[in-house]
Amino acid sequence: MRRQRSAVPILALLALLALLALIVGLGASGCAWKPPTTRPSPPNTCKDSDGPTADTVRQAIAAVPIVVPGSKWVEITRGHTRNCRLHWVQIIPTIASQSTPQQLLFFDRNIPLGSPTRNPKPYITVLPAGDDTVTVQYQWQIGSDQECCPTGIGTVRFHIGSDGKLEALGSIPHQ
C-alpha cells in the first residue's frame, strides 16, 4: 500500500513564502528609507526670440582671441536663466583636448555682455540655471593631476547687475 503525502508541509511552505514576500514588499514599497526626490524643473517658457540672434552670437565668438593656432571657436552648448533674460553660449576651439581652454559668452537677451574671465579656462561646466542666475563650475589641475581628472573645483554664480553688466556673485575660482 502506498502512503499519501500530507499537503500540510506544502501549505506551510507556501504560507511562509507568502509572508516573506509581504515583508519584503512592504520594505520596498514604503516602510524603508528612500532617497529624497528632487523637485522637477519648471517647464522652459523661453522663446528663441528671447535670446541672442545667430548674428549676435557669431559676432561675439569672432571677437574672442584664438588660443589654439590653426583652430577657430565653435559653439558646443548654450542655455539661459528661467526668466529668459540672461543667456550663455559655451565655445571651444576646433582643435581641442580634455584640458583645452574654453570660454563662456553671456548675453542680456540680444545684447552681448562678454565673458566673465579675461582668459579662457579648461573644464567649464554650466550647472542648472536659476530664475536670474547662471552657476558656473570651474575645475583645474592641481599638482600631478592627470588631464582627465582635475581635482581643483569651485563655482560662482553670475547675474545681470543693476548697471546692466554681467556680475559675479562671489569670486571666480582659480584666477
Curated annotation (Swiss-Prot):
Lipid-bearing positions (N-palmitoyl cysteine): C31
Lipid bilayer topology: Lipid-anchor
The keyword Nuclease is annotated on this UniProt entry: no
PROSITE patterns cross-referenced by the UniProt entry: PROKAR_LIPOPROTEIN
Keywords: Cell membrane, Lipoprotein, Membrane, Palmitate, Signal
Leader sequence segment: 1-30
Lipid moiety-binding region (S-diacylglycerol cysteine): C31
Descriptive protein name: Putative lipoprotein LppP
Pfam families (alphabetical): Lipoprotein_21
Subcellular location, record wording: Cell membrane
